[in-house]
Amino acid sequence: MEVISTNTNGSTIFKNGAIPMNGHQNGTSEHLNGYQNGTSKHQNGHQNGTFEHRNGHQNGTSEQQNGTISHDNGNELLGSSDSIKPGWFSEFSALWPGEAFSLKVEKLLFQGKSDYQDVMLFESATYGKVLTLDGAIQHTENGGFPYTEMIVHLPLGSIPNPKKVLIIGGGIGFTLFEMLRYPSIEKIDIVEIDDVVVDVSRKFFPYLAANFNDPRVTLVLGDGAAFVKAAQAGYYDAIIVDSSDPIGPAKDLFERPFFEAVAKALRPGGVVCTQAESIWLHMHIIKQIIANCRQVFKGSVNYAWTTVPTYPTGVIGYMLCSTEGPEVDFKNPVNPIDKETTQVKSKLGPLKFYNSDIHKAAFILPSFARSMIES
C-alpha cells in the first residue's frame, strides 16, 4: 500500500494507528470538564447549570441539528462529543426535520473532532459498531452491508472486467472490501479527506484496514474533488463516490463541476456511482443531482435505491451514470458478482445482500418517484 498525504491546512496525520481520544489537535489543550470559578464549562458549553450544546440546547430548549447521546433516565441530554457513558444515540438533522433515529449505546469507543468534522464510533446493542460524522450515521457494522454492496456492485457489475477504479471517501474500508471481489481489478485509488476516519479504521476495524496494504491500493489523504480534477483524462473504468450527505466537507461532491471532472477522468463507457439520498425526504436534492448529471454524462443516467435499516426513512439512493462510448445497461448486469469464484468466497465470505435479482429490482421506482425523476 502507498499512503499519500495531500493535506495542506496543517492537519495532523497520525502515524502507527495513534488516535487522539479526546480530539486535541494542533497543539491546543481544551479539557473536557474545564472547571472554572465553580462553574462547569464543558467542551460543549455547560455553564451555570444551563446547557449550551454545539447543536443548540440552551436553558431547556431543544434545537438539535446533529446526533446526541442521552442517558437512560432521560433527564440529561448530552452532545455527541460530550458523553462517554452508555445511553441512547439519537440522530437529528435539518436534512430530515421532524424525525429522529435512536440506537442503544453499549459502549462509546471513540470521540474526537478532526479538521473537518466530529467523528464518533460506538458499540450499539443491535447493529455492532456505528460510525457517525457530525452526528449522522455513516455506517453500521451489522446493518450497513446493503449500502456498501450496492454502491460497489451496481456499477462494477454493469461493465465487463473493470481494471482501474477510484473510491472517493470510504476511509473506513467497507467499500474497498467489496471491491476486492473482482479479480480483474488492477488498480484502486482511495481518496479520503479525513485522516481521523482512517485512523479509526486501523484501530477498530483492523480486518478492513488490512486491505489498505493490498499492492493494488493507493490511499490518498486529501480532497476528493481536487483529486478528480487533477486526474488523467480517461484513466478510470469506474468511480465510486462513497460520500456523506451534501453538507459540510461533502457538499462539493454533489455539484456540477465535480461531475464534469468525474466524466473527464472516466474512459469512454466508464461508470460512476454516487450516494444520492432518500426518495422519501430529498426529492428536491435528487432532482438537482439528476439535472446536473444529464447535462454532463452523455451515456446513460439512472437512479436506483435500496434499503438500509439505519439510514433516514430506511432507504438510500444511488446515481449511476456512464460516459459516451460503449453502451452501459445498468439494469441488466453483465458482470454478476454473485457468480464469483469459490476462491474469492472463501477469502471474503459470501455476499449478504446483493444478487442479480436485487440489482435489477433496484431500478424499479415507486410511481411518485418515477414521475418526478423522469420529468
Swiss-Prot record:
Residue span, PABS domain: 86-323
Q: Which InterPro entries match?
A: PABS (IPR030374), PABS_CS (IPR030373), Putrescine_N-MeTfrase (IPR025803), SAM-dependent_MTases_sf (IPR029063), Spermi_synthase (IPR001045), Spermidine_synt_N (IPR035246), Spermidine_synt_N_sf (IPR037163)
Example of a GO biological process term: response to auxin
Entries under NCBIfam families matching the protein: PRK00811.1, speE
Q: What gene makes this protein?
A: PMT1
Source domain of life: Eukaryota
Kindly summarize what the UniProt induction comment says about this protein's expression: Down-regulated by auxin. Accumulates upon the removal of flower heads and young leaves. Triggered by jasmonic acid (MeJA).
Q: Which Cys-Cys disulphide bridges does the record give?
A: none
Descriptive protein name: Putrescine N-methyltransferase 1
The positions flagged as active site in the entry are D242 (proton acceptor)
Query: Polar residues compositional bias: what residue ranges?
Result: 24-50, 57-77
Report the CDD domains cross-referenced here: AdoMet_MTases
One molecular function GO term is: putrescine N-methyltransferase activity
> Which pathway is this protein assigned to?
Alkaloid biosynthesis; nicotine biosynthesis
